[in-house]
């Protein structure tokens, strides 16, 4: 967890920022972190960073376009030095809040905060943002971010008392709350909404900046129509992929490979891990000549790094029990064989 001093420093940055620009990861932890901080100060715009794993110089066009006075980076493990140098050149402060197991940036121009580096716990950025904003009315937004990132926060019972109709009673794991409750369904609606056109994602974000409570998301009207439509479309495809993946259980390993126009790998990996607790889950999405991989299981980070070791161009990393990797499809057989040996 961040220290009280660090939390106060971030609050000061937020209060000072008159036109902040938030870059955040393309998942519920990133989205809800942005929403919690934007709703706290009532200003600022958000940019979803779909490129993995870093915020690179190509993203700076949004800075040139929107002319912010502050840059906040949320839930991203890497930021390119070229991006930092350009912000420095433009005299724009950068506040970077993360929770991944990575080294702090060497460039001290960046105000860097990482919950993993503080005590090794690595609470999600949505949890940190909730503690920073300290707005009880947004407890449900924070909870969505936390359970989506496999973290059961200390405010779960408080949430359950406020929204008993949405909560699962006494969940044993974060994914119990995510997959066996109504707040979990709302989380999946938002997650799938992020996988839409840029225009629709921006409209969803604008709606979420003003929404007063979770039930508004479930009410079908002109504002929520596209959000719910996207969920229905993707959920149908997602359930079919799940059914196919469930067949691929072998000993300790569940390995599933698929293709298509859209990656749902981390969603599939999370739910399969929930359903098959004792299995090591590997979900591979193949697009042209690249394989994007989501991995879930004990020591997933060590297994991932060992499996991609010495594979040219391969990248990977993440948390202890949840990681991602990217490599050329020609190297997939080698990667799969290594994983099988490491988890047998």
Each predicted region: which residue ranges?
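Accessory alpha-helical/coil subdomains and C-terminal extensions
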Residues: 154-240
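Long, well-ordered mid-to-C-terminal structural blocks that present hydrophobic/aromatic surfaces
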Residues: 217-277
């Amino acid at each position: 967890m961040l220290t009280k001093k660090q939390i106060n420093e971030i609050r000061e940055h937020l209060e000072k920022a008159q036109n902040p620009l938030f870059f955040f990861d393309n998942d519920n932890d990133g989205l809800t972190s942005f929403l919690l901080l934007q709703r706290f100060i009532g200003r600022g715009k958000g940019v979803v960073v779909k490129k993995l794993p870093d915020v690179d110089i190509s993203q700076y066009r949004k800075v040139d376009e929107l002319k912010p006075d502050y840059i906040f980076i949320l839930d991203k493990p890497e930021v390119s030095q070229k991006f930092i140098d350009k912000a420095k050149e433009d005299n724009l402060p950068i506040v970077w809040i993360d929770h991944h197991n990575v080294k702090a940036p060497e460039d001290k121009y960046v105000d860097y905060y990482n919950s993993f580096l503080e005590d090794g716990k690595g609470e999600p950025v949505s949890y940190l943002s909730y503690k920073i904003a300290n707005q009880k009315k947004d407890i449900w937004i924070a909870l969505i971010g936390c359970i989506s990132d496999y973290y059961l926060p200390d405010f779960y019972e408080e949430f359950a008392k406020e929204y008993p109709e949405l909560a699962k009673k006494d969940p044993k794991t974060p994914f119990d709350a995510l997959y066996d409750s109504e707040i979990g369904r709302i989380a999946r609606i938002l997650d799938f909404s992020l996988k839409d056109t840029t225009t629709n994602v921006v409209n969803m974000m604008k709606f979420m900046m003003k929404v007063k409570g979770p039930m508004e998301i479930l009410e079908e009207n002109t504002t929520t129509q596209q959000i719910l439509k996207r969920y229905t479309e993707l959920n149908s495809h997602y359930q079919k992929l799940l059914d196919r993946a469930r067949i691929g259980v072998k000993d300790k390993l569940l390995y599933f490979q698929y293709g298509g126009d859209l990656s749902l790998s981390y969603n599939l990996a999370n739910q399969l891990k929930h359903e098959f607790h004792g299995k090591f889950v590997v979900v591979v999405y193949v697009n042209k000549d690249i394989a994007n991989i989501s991995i879930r299981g004990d020591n997933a980070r060590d297994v991932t790094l060992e499996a991609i070791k010495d594979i040219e161009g391969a990248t990977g990393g993440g948390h202890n029990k949840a990681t991602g990797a990217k490599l050329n499809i020609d190297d997939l057989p080698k990667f799969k064989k290594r994983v099988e040996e490491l988890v047998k």
